[in-house]
Amino acid sequence: AIAPEVDAVLISHPDTAHVGALPYAFGKLGMNCKVYATLPVHKMGQMYMYDHFLTRQDQGDFQNVFSLDDVDTAFAAFMPVKYMQLSMLRGKGDGISVMAYAAGHTLGGAVWKIGKDAEDVVYAVDYNVRKERHLNGTSFDAIHRPALLITDASSIEREVPNKTTRDAKIVDSILSSLRMNGNVLIPIDPAGRV
């Protein structure tokens, strides 16, 4: 069993893809370590996992995966950090530092720099370099030549629409519906990617 040997967990975003296994690891696999994340990721991730549990609990394939108590146990281990706050690990991780940088993809989302001596490892998944209305894009200016960069290419094929055109289309659609005495419902991702 590897989970009891884990010294620290770094969480980058609050959605199921990034935090979904944590309650299971704490509740069923015996994980017992500090979990580092920004405060928004901590709070939204906890709400997201409550919601995930409540919407899936009656499905046969989900029963006994984890409980709400497992969610509480996992999120009680969180150590909230601020962007650019240097945190030093203790115990077997003595001498290892971690620092969160804004990922620009979700509220509180983080790119992580993990350092030991003169070597840095950067973990950067689901980041966005473009400034949006509610989030600044990420910047790698403070990260210089890491020994290892871990990233993803999940959005590489996604075509990014022109911001002005996109905004005009949604406003036109909303106004058209309202002018016909219709209702407008705008569903959003509960994990902070609004």
Give the residues covered by each predicted segment:
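His/Asp/Glu-rich metal-coordinating catalytic cores
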Residues: 1-10, 15-19, 24-193
